[in-house]
């Protein structure tokens, strides 16, 4: 079976985001600022515009933070919705398809990590502390008693994410070595 074209996957991601946003009431629409949802939007932009490196940046944000955070939340709360499952799994499928098609580009880790770090800071200043989007106001509930204040928690999260992003980069590079070599050695 032939994989869907990038534009179709981009539109599917936009549709999933719209569906999930529609499921939020006014008090919880800020939850759409969680990095996983922003990463989905970044992936959609990359897929629709044909910017592979942008799509890859969104994908590594999902692999390194979004999916792990979502799975931990589902495990802790025993609660999710159909739109949440869709908006978390569809980007993974689209990312895998596109990375298999075009390989894994170089230079994705540090820009993605900086984006994550700046996004969390912006959420600290713009979101309701009660919702704690991206743990911008404190550590995740189940481990809050082990962490220091918000800034120590943020620094620890940022360091963990940097390691996770580098590990994902190594794995994705190895899994797509032949395509990545072809991508980087092809004439412009």
Predicted regions: what is each one?
Residues 38-48, 89-101, 153-171:
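Hydrophobic cores of alpha-helical transmembrane segments in multi-pass inner/ER membrane proteins
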Residues 13-60:
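Long, hydrophobic N-terminal alpha-helical segment
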Residues 22-29, 72-82, 101-102:
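Membrane-interface helix caps and helix-loop-helix hairpins in membrane proteins
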Residues 168-185:
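Membrane-interface capping segments at transmembrane-helix boundaries
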Residues 13-22, 61-73, 114-125:
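Aromatic-anchored segments of alpha-helical transmembrane domains
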Residues 45-49, 53, 66-76, 97:
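Membrane-helix exit/interface motif
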Residues 1-11:
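N-terminal membrane topogenic signal
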Residues 128-168:
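Membrane-interface transmembrane-helix boundary segments in multi-pass integral membrane proteins
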């Amino acid at each position: 079976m032939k994989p869907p074209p990038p534009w179709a996957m981009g539109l599917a991601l936009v549709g999933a985001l719209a569906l999930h946003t529609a499921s939020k009431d006014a008090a919880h629409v800020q939850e759409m600022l969680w990095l996983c949802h922003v990463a989905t939007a970044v992936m959609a932009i990359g897929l629709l515009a044909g910017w592979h490196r942008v799509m890859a940046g969104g994908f590594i944000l999902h692999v390194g933070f979004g999916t792990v955070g979502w799975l931990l939340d589902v495990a802790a709360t025993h609660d999710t919705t159909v739109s949440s499952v869709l908006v978390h799994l569809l980007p993974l499928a689209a990312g895998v398809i596109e990375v298999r098609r075009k390989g894994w580009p170089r230079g994705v880790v540090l820009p993605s990590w900086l984006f994550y770090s700046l996004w969390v800071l912006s959420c600290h200043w713009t979101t309701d502390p009660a919702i704690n989007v991206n743990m911008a106001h404190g550590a995740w509930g189940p481990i809050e008693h082990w962490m220091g204040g918000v800034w120590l928690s943020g620094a620890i999260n940022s360091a963990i994410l940097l390691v996770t992003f580098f590990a994902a980069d190594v794995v994705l590079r190895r899994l797509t070595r032949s395509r990545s070599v072809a991508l980087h050695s092809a004439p412009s």
